[in-house]
Amino acid sequence: MVGSRHPDQCAKRWHHSLDPNVKRGPWTMEEDSSLLEAVQKIGRDWKEIGRELFPSRSTTDIKNRYVILSRRRGPSPAIPENCSSIDIETHSSSLADSKPPIPAELLTPEVDFSIANTPCELDSSNLAPDTLSINMTLPSDLPSYLSLPLPDTAETDHALDESSTAWEIPDWTAFDNQCLFTPGASELEGSFTSRNHEEPPQPLPVPDIPGPSTLVLEDLRPETVNLVIDTLLRTNSKFGMRMYNTGS
């Protein structure tokens, strides 16, 4: 008669929903108590419990009722084999909540916080070179070229123009000692005042010699050479320079 259904489906449908002899009404408190006691004695053999105590109820109804009662009473210490997924989740969350708190000494290692109030003494020998403050004096014959002052064209209003500065090699064979005026390093340094005092520099004493002059400077420090170049630029002098190393 029902060709689209399997015989097992028809039997289950009849037994669980259509059989008038199967009780489908609400459970009473006496039935709930009897069901819980039967599970404690017999176990979760729903067919056996149904034959002995609830012949008018289906095994599926008995099982579902026990799951509902278990959820109301709270999770049992052990997870049932035939328990639903809802019961398993409830049981797991209850076990997680019932775990004792982990001692703090297991989470955080013991630390003596009094060390934070103790002055820290560093050994400078273990520090990196760039973290030390070294106060040392360089030899006088080894000047620091990075700290040498260069002529400030913004203050002197003179720019070093390559077209007006001829880097020529003079004819040393025509050198005349009588027209040579070479002031010493102390005279050059004494004729200038540091720019920190904001005083105008004094001109160098130049002999009154007509015609071109040749100036030879030997064994000068780099800062002295800078002072000479600055003076020539200030006076708008046309000059040629040749720097060479005579060797030691």
Curated annotation (Swiss-Prot):
Region (Disordered): 1-25, 186-208
Domain named HTH myb-type: residues: 19-74
Phenotype on disruption: Abolishes the production of cichorine.
Subcellular location: Nucleus
Residue ranges of DNA binding: 46-70
Keyword DNA-binding tagged: yes
Matches recorded under CDD domains: SANT_TRF
GO cellular component assignments: nucleus
GO molecular function, one term: RNA polymerase II cis-regulatory region sequence-specific DNA binding
Amino acid composition bias (Basic and acidic residues), ranges on this chain: 1-22
Keywords: DNA-binding, Nucleus, Transcription, Transcription regulation
Function description: Transcription factor that regulates the expression of the gene cluster that mediates the biosynthesis of cichorine, a phytotoxin active against knapweed, corn, and soybeans.
Name by which UniProt lists this protein: Transcription factor cicD
Organism: Emericella nidulans (strain FGSC A4 / ATCC 38163 / CBS 112.46 / NRRL 194 / M139) (Aspergillus nidulans)
